[in-house]
């Protein structure tokens, strides 16, 4: 149990450090950003396919945005402030394809993060995931938009 707490503390610290660094052009205005790290190799997880869905009033999921993580393990520019309205969203990381390209047979097909966004006013969200072939952990940093 203590090792799990230490692991989660380290993950939260990593997200904090990545958020505290200098923002590049456009990054500070990105309302939804995804960061994926490979726990086996200790590096950013590159080319992870990411799909974002928005829950409809009927309860089904409609495609909202998609992309792949860059060399930094980050995916920016998924949406705009105007499109990222209050609602329930699902971020789906294609973990199986990522591990298969590395020659590893993983347990999970996907890693999903489901969350309510902007219910307390407009915010910016960083969803961070730490992947290994048989587990994953996620956390989020929710902040006020920077002008």
From Swiss-Prot:
Source species of the chain: Mus musculus
Pfam families: Transthyretin (PF00576)
Protein name (database record): Transthyretin
Listed GO MF terms: hormone activity; hormone binding; identical protein binding; molecular sequestering activity; protein-containing complex binding
Summary of subunit composition and partner proteins: Homotetramer. Dimer of dimers. In the homotetramer, subunits assemble around a central channel that can accommodate two ligand molecules. Interacts with RBP4.
Post-translational modifications reported in the UniProt record: Sulfonation of the reactive cysteine Cys-30 enhances the stability of the native conformation of TTR, avoiding misassembly of the protein leading to amyloid formation.
Signal peptide residue numbers: 1-20
Key words, A-Z: Gamma-carboxyglutamic acid, Glycoprotein, Hormone, Phosphoprotein, Secreted, Signal, Sulfation, Thyroid hormone, Transport
């Amino acid at each position: 149990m203590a090792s799990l707490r230490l692991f989660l503390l380290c993950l939260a610290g990593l997200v904090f450090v990545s958020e505290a660094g200098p923002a590049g052009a456009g990054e500070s205005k990105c309302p939804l950003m995804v960061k994926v790290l490979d726990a086996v190799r200790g590096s950013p997880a590159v080319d992870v396919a990411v799909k974002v869905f928005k829950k409809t009033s009927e309860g089904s999921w409609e495609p909202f945005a998609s992309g792949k993580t860059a060399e930094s393990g980050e995916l920016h520019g998924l949406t705009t402030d105007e499109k990222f309205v209050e609602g329930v969203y699902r971020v789906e990381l294609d973990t199986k394809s990522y591990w298969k390209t590395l020659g590893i047979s993983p347990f999970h097909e996907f890693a999903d993060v489901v969350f309510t966004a902007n219910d307390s006013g407009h915010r910016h969200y960083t969803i961070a995931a730490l992947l290994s072939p048989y587990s994953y952990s996620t956390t989020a940093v929710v902040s006020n938009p920077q002008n």
